[in-house]
């Protein structure tokens, strides 16, 4: 019997969560990949840390998998953000080897201009995740015909989002 490696764990998680909600899993994979590319471009973290943060990015909406809310992704990404953030934080903190990074999930919907009110060793990555998450959410909504103000991300720079992740997103390939 072979040892399970991180690639196997990723595949198991994706296949399992995809059976519950393909839409949420697709969003999670896009956000995780975007976060990976931003951190890779930033070149400030070890590959091991980038992989851990990418897994957190993929699991950032794990709290949505409570059966009564999983089908309402857009509502929980735009309006009711704290319930799934708290559930996701608890999942990561108590049921995963990434417990030291659970606060990233808890705060991934916190406005950037409120970061000074909390203590976390991961606020920089949290800011990157928040941008990647919102960017994919608005991109998906725009594709469905919902009008998304083109200047939203510029208007919200350093209010809702840190300017740094937007800079990284625009430059990372």
Pin down the residues of each PLM region.
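Histidine/acidic-rich helix-loop-helix segments that form or flank divalent-metal centers
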Residues: 51-57, 92, 98-145, 149-173
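Acidic/His-rich, divalent-metal-binding segments that scaffold phosphate/diphosphate chemistry
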Residues: 1-99, 117-122, 140, 173
């Amino acid at each position: 019997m072979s040892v399970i490696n991180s690639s196997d764990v990723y595949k198991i998680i994706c296949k399992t969560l995809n059976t519950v909600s393909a839409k949420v899993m697709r969003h999670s994979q896009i956000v995780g990949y975007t976060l990976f590319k931003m951190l890779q471009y930033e070149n400030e973290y070890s590959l091991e840390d980038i992989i851990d943060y990418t897994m957190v990015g993929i699991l950032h909406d794990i709290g949505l998998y409570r059966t009564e809310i999983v089908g309402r992704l857009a509502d929980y990404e735009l309006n009711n953000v704290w319930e799934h953030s708290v559930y996701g934080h608890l999942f990561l903190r108590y049921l995963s080897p990434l417990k030291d990074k659970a606060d990233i999930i808890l705060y991934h919907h916190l406005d950037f201009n409120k970061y000074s009110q909390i203590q976390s060793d991961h606020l920089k990555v949290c800011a990157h995740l928040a941008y990647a998450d919102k960017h994919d959410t608005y991109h998906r909504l725009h594709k469905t015909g919902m009008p998304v103000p083109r200047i939203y991300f510029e208007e919200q720079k350093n209010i809702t989002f840190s300017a740094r992740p937007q800079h990284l997103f625009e430059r990372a390939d």
